[in-house]
Structure formats: structure tokens, C-alpha cells
């Protein structure tokens, strides 16, 4: 079972609203077939949170989104 907490992610991204956006965009990328940056057999949402908690991805996800 996947155990990841918001507190683990907030160490990397202190604003929980930006954390939600970054995790959403990364999970969407993973669901579309992008390669995960960590070894994980979890669903895209959990994998995205694990990547953020591990420092493998973060707020740069927000800079990739066209405005």
C-alpha cells in the first residue's frame, strides 16, 4: 500500500496549493505515458507525490504549463 503524506511533500513545496497543481500536472504527464523519475508501480497520482517528496520534481511543473 502506498504511504505518502502531504507533510513529506510540503518539505519540498511549502505552498499546499502550488503542491496540488504541481502534483496534478505531473500525474497527468505520467498518465499520458511520460517516464517516471523514480521506480514505482503505483498509480500516476501516488507516483507524482513520491517524486515531489523525493525532490525529483517540483515547481518546475508549473513553469511548463502554457498560460
Curated annotation (Swiss-Prot):
UniProt catalytic activity: RNA(n) + a ribonucleoside 5'-triphosphate = RNA(n+1) + diphosphate
Name of the molecule in the record: DNA-directed RNA polymerase subunit omega
Keywords associated with the record: DNA-directed RNA polymerase, Nucleotidyltransferase, Transcription, Transferase
GO biological process, one term: DNA-templated transcription
UniProt xrefs under SMART domains: RNA_pol_Rpb6
GO cellular component: DNA-directed RNA polymerase complex
Family assignment from sequence similarity: Belongs to the RNA polymerase subunit omega family.
Oligomeric form and interacting partners: The RNAP catalytic core consists of 2 alpha, 1 beta, 1 beta' and 1 omega subunit. When a sigma factor is associated with the core the holoenzyme is formed, which can initiate transcription.
Documented EC number(s): 2.7.7.6
One Pfam family from the record: RNA_pol_Rpb6
GO MF annotations, alphabetized: DNA binding; DNA-directed RNA polymerase activity
InterPro entries assigned: DNA-dir_RNA_pol_omega, Pol_omega/Rpo6/RPB6, RPB6/omega-like_sf
Physiological role: Promotes RNA polymerase assembly. Latches the N- and C-terminal regions of the beta' subunit thereby facilitating its interaction with the beta and alpha subunits.
Amino acid at each position: 500500500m502506498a504511504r505518502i503524506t502531504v507533510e513529506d511533500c510540503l518539505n519540498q513545496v511549502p505552498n499546499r496549493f502550488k503542491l496540488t497543481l504541481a502534483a496534478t500536472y505531473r500525474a497527468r504527464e505520467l498518465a499520458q505515458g511520460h517516464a517516471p523519475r523514480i521506480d514505482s508501480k503505483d498509480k500516476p497520482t501516488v507516483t507524482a507525490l513520491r517524486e515531489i517528496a523525493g525532490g525529483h520534481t517540483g515547481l518546475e511543473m508549473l513553469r511548463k504549463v502554457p498560460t
